[in-house]
Design a protein with these regions (language model features):
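Transmembrane helix-loop junctions in multipass membrane proteins, especially transporters and channels
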Residues: 27-31, 76-77, 111-115, 144, ...
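Hydrophobic core segments of alpha-helical transmembrane domains in multi-pass membrane transport
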Residues: 14-23, 44, 62-72, 93-108, ...
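Structural motif marking the loop-to-transmembrane transition
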Residues: 5-9, 51-55, 59, 85, ...
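Helix-loop-helix hairpins and the membrane-proximal interhelical loops
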Residues: 1-6, 119-121, 152-235
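Short, amphipathic, aromatic/basic-enriched membrane-interface segments that mark the entry/exit
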Residues: 1-7, 25-31, 118-128, 265-275, ...
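Helix-loop-helix junctions within the multi-pass membrane cores of secondary transporters/permeases
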Residues: 14-15, 24, 35-93, 219-302
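Membrane-helix interface "capping/anchor" motifs
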Residues: 20-34, 141-152, 267-273
Length: 302
């Protein structure tokens, strides 16, 4: 029941603000946006299955954000990271890589749903799957040749190739950003002290906590940023993450978290807050070029 246009605008606004803050305050190459897994929990579990309003769900996200701020100030989140064994920290980065790969294969329909085996190989001879394979080959060649911006070039080339394939659908170039007013500061405090609210907040807290920790450890490991088993300026990164979640709820979006696609920037050499800062600015630009960016097929980014 949420306004789609308002959701688009608020997602871009909060992602841009949080990512820029990560670059300026934490000085780390991590980008933030509403997490897809938590988005699914917000929409399907809380609203559709449990039957609560989206205003109720936003209230739960807001409370979760406040708790995260408290846990960050008291260094609880840092202590959790410290007690994770070194071998597990390294394996987390591997797991995140596999997770990203699976998302990409699924988006490109190379891996599809199967009732008997859960997943199976899709039709690789046409459509998004074939386009994705072409994109993988193009991007791989560029990466091997160490071409600057290899992944970006690969996405652009794959998008253009997708036009004759009928996969890329051009939607225009520029549009005026929709207003965020329909979902701004829309909370429901009537059931704040109910057992259901406690369960939902705890679930959001638990998933977001380990999602963020796993992403930070995995991407930082890939970037070679971990010194003596510790991530530099970790507390600042956690604080940005907590503030983003709280602010995101106020603006009308689900839990904002550091997302695994940050690995793409690291892979291209990003090691400082400048990476996050530029990414945040690109988020703002995309607000006005939404039709153009929405023309990029998932097979090209997969």
């Amino acid at each position: 029941g949420m306004d789609r246009g308002a959701l688009f605008s608020t997602t871009v606004f909060i992602s841009a603000a949080a990512t820029i803050l990560m670059g300026l305050y934490a000085k780390l190459p991590f980008a933030l946006a509403p997490g897809m897994g938590l988005n699914a929990f917000f929409a399907y579990t809380i609203c559709l299955i449990m039957g609560y309003s989206w205003q109720f769900a936003l209230t739960a996200v807001f409370i979760e954000g406040l708790i995260f701020i408290l846990l960050t100030v008291t260094n609880v989140r840092e202590k959790i990271v410290d007690i994770i064994p070194e071998t597990l920290k390294k394996s987390i980065s591997v797991g995140i890589g596999i997770y990203i790969a699976f998302i990409g294969l699924s988006s490109a329909e190379i891996v599809v749903n199967n009732d008997a085996t859960l997943v199976s190989i899709g039709d690789l001879t046409r459509g998004p799957a074939l386009l994705c394979i072409i994109g993988i080959v193009v991007s791989s060649v560029l990466l091997i040749k160490k071409v600057p911006g290899a992944l970006l070039i690969g996405i652009i080339v794959t998008t253009l190739i997708g036009i004759p394939f009928g996969v890329t659908q051009f939607n225009g170039v520029i549009s005026v950003p929709p207003s965020v007013e329909p979902i701004l500061c829309k909370f429901d405090w009537a059931k704040i002290f109910t057992p259901e609210m406690f369960v939902i907040v705890f679930t959001l807290l638990f998933v977001d906590l380990f999602d963020t920790i796993g992403t930070l450890i995995g991407v930082a490991t890939r970037a070679g940023m971990i010194k003596n088993g510790k991530i530099p300026r970790l507390k600042q990164a956690f604080m940005v993450d907590a503030l983003a979640t709280t602010s995101g709820a106020i603006m009308g979006t689900s839990t904002v978290t550091t997302f695994v696609e940050s690995a793409a920037g690291v892979e291209q050499g990003g090691r400082s807050g400048l990476t996050a800062f530029v990414c945040g600015l690109c988020f703002l630009v995309s607000l006005f070029f939404a039709p153009l960016f929405l023309s990029i097929p998932s097979a090209a980014t997969a």
